[in-house]
From Swiss-Prot:
One of its GO terms (molecular function) is DNA-binding transcription factor activity. It comes from Arabidopsis thaliana. This is Transcription factor bHLH117. InterPro entries: bHLH95_bHLH, bHLH_dom, HLH_DNA-bd_sf, IND-like. Residues 130-179 form the bHLH domain. Residues 103-141 are annotated as: Disordered.
Length: 252
């Protein structure tokens, strides 16, 4: 029996194939509008898609430009569609470098080792050098002031003896108290004596020739007399003051 021959001018004249030939065994069909996405997902899984999805720039390149190139079914297209490939990372960095550096400064390329070492040395010298120098200058100034005050106390003393710091402070305290008492006594002392004290005090010829003001001036300018008075804990006062003290003590 002869099989009849059919002549077809083009593929469009062929009879349609039964749908059962294109149906999978598990009866799962792919809609036409999800076909391109399923192919794209399977391709991206080979390229470690979970790493590519972290970069917004790569997602934009793959889902915009590649999608339109791979799945553009146009009868007028004469060139073959290229296969999915990774973009030029160097060109992407060159284009996106300013935006990346502005948004993520930590992702900017590291500085050279020599320049980084120079910056670190400059910052360390700036932060650690100035406070130490200022502190040293303040300590030196305080020590100088303390030394000047101690020398002033030593000059105030009526004697010239080498003493340590503790002895200098103790003796200066005693001598300052003596000076305060002596000043209070001289402030209320009469300038001229109103009593004849030749028989009671036992004045010598030298004392008789001097006035009260001259005698006080001699005592003030004599380191020996001040040393004796301060060491005994007494001060100079007049005869009038002595009589006043006796009168006050009797009335008490």
């Amino acid at each position: 029996m002869e099989t009849p021959a059919y002549d077809f001018d083009s593929l469009t004249d062929l009879p349609p194939l039964p749908p059962s030939d294109f149906t999978p065994s598990n009866a799962f069909t792919f809609p036409d509008h999800n076909l391109d996405f399923s192919f794209l997902d399977s391709t991206l899984s080979l390229l470690n898609r979970h790493h590519l999805s972290e970069s917004t720039r790569l997602e934009q390149i793959f889902y915009d430009s590649t999608h339109t190139q791979l799945f553009h079914n146009d009868d007028t297209t004469t060139t073959t569609t290229p296969f999915l490939h990774l973009p030029d990372l160097k060109s992407i960095d060159a284009v996106e470098e300013p935006t990346t550096m502005k948004l993520f400064p930590s992702l900017s390329p590291p500085l050279p080792a020599a320049k980084r070492q120079k910056l670190n040395s400059t910052s360390s010298s700036t932060t650690s050098g100035s406070p130490t120098a200022s502190n040293d200058g303040g300590i030196i100034t305080k020590r100088r002031k303390i030394s000047d005050k101690i020398r002033s106390l030593e000059k105030l003393m009526p004697w010239e003896r080498k003493m340590n710091l503790a002895m200098t402070l103790e003796e200066s305290h005693k001598y300052i108290k003596f000076l305060q008492s002596q000043i209070a006594s001289l402030r209320w002392m009469p300038l001229e004596s109103v009593y004849n004290t030749a028989g009671e005090v036992g004045e010598t010829d030298l004392l008789k020739s001097l006035t009260r003001q001259q005698i006080l001036q001699v005592l003030a300018n004599s380191p020996g007399s001040r040393n004796v008075l301060s060491s005994r804990g007494v001060c100079v006062f007049s005869y009038e003051q002595l009589l006043s003290l006796k009168t006050m003590s009797r009335n008490l």
